Structures are given as C-alpha cells and as structure tokens.
C-alpha cells in the first residue's frame, strides 16, 4: 500500500465522502465513471461492486455497443487497466448468464477469465437488504498479441439442477458447478 496510489470514482456524494474519510490519501472523485478523466492502460487493478440496472451509459468510446450500466463498467474498466492488469467485480449473474453475449464477446478476445464464483441470492440480504444472485468475476487484461488461455465463458448452456429443471447458465459454471454456492432453482424473478 505504501507505494501504491488509490483512485476511486463514486457518483453518490455521501458514499464518496465516506470513502474520502476512510481513505484520506486516496484520490476519490465524486462523479460518474463515464465522465471520470482516467488514463487508459494505467491502472493495475480495477475493483467494483458494479451498479445494477438496465439503462445505457453515454460514453462516445463505447456508445456503439449500447451496454447497460453493469456491462459498461466491465468494458470501460478494461480500457483503464494496463495489459496484465486485473478486473475484480461483484456483478449480477446476468453478466455471465444472459443470452445476449455481446459483453462476453467484447471482453473475451481482450481479457482472460481467471475465475468466477456464484454467490447465493442471500449473500447481501443482511447488510444491503437485497436478494440478488451475484457473481464475483476476475479477469486479466491480455498483453498485446497474447491469446487467451483461460476457460471458456462466452456461451450459455442448459444446466440441470437437483430438481431436474433446466436452467440457462454460463458454460464456465456448467463445467464447474462447485463454484455455485447455494441451490440453483428457477424463480420468476429478474435475476
């Protein structure tokens, strides 16, 4: 920590003030990620609990993809970390499981999936009051000319749970069911 610099971007003023109080030596910026002036290819690590939502973000560098906000955070962070840099995010299961693979197709040739773990929908119930199935996803930005060697994670396949229900989930988790904590079941909820 002594030889590192921490930069934080937080749109909520109260949360930004708390971060500034907790980390007085950090550069905490109270603004949206899309408007933060951050150098491309500079950061060693990007860490976020990405915002949930299905609304687009206006950013000329990524507008063509029409990424919803949580996908935008992945794509924008990939621009900001250096080759070999890491992205470690808490995100909804939609990042890995949605049938629209636009984000995964965008990321896969540029970043290697180092790993992911699926948390049960109750993981944040006590402290945040939410019941959303979330994933912790870790990516490494590839070096120029490097080919990804990590596991397959672009496609969604059917997974049969303990009740013999077929559930569409990411191929990474189909091949590694031990990385899904809790019990998989179909519900009528968004995530």
Give residue ranges: language-model regions:
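A short acidic, often aromatic-flanked loop/helix-cap motif at beta-alpha or helix-coil junctions
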Residues: 34-38, 122-126, 189-190
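Generic "edge-of-domain/loop-turn" microfeature
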Residues: 57, 96, 144-146
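Conserved S-adenosyl-L-methionine
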Residues: 1-55, 84, 92-94, 137
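Conserved Class I SAM-dependent methyltransferase catalytic core
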Residues: 9-13, 18, 30, 64-125, ...
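Flexible loop residues that form catalytic
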Residues: 51, 121, 142
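Short, solvent-exposed coil/turn linker segments
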Residues: 2, 32, 55, 68, ...
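Conserved ATPase-coupling elements of RecA-like P-loop NTPase cores
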Residues: 55-59, 99-100
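Flexible, glycine-/basic-rich loop-and-beta segments that form/coincide
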Residues: 126-191
């Amino acid at each position: 920590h002594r030889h590192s610099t921490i930069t934080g971007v937080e749109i909520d003023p109260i949360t930004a003030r708390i971060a500034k109080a907790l980390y007085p030596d950090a550069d905490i910026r109270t603004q949206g990620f899309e408007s933060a002036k951050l150098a491309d290819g500079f950061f060693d690590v990007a860490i976020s609990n990405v915002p949930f939502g299905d609304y687009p973000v206006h950013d000329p560098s990524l507008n063509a993809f029409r990424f919803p906000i949580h996908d935008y955070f992945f794509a924008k962070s990939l621009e900001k970390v250096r080759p070999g840099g890491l992205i470690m995010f808490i995100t909804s299961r939609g990042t890995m499981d949605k049938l629209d693979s636009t984000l995964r197709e965008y990321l896969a040739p540029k970043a290697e999936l180092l790993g992911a773990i699926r948390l049960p929908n109750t993981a944040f119930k006590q402290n945040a009051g939410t019941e959303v199935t979330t994933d912790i996803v870790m990516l490494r930005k590839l070096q120029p000319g490097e080919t990804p060697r990590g596991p397959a994670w672009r496609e969604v396949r059917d997974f049969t749970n303990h009740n013999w229900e077929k559930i569409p989930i990411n191929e990474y988790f189909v091949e590694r069911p031990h990385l899904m904590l809790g019990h998989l079941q179909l519900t009528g909820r968004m995530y």
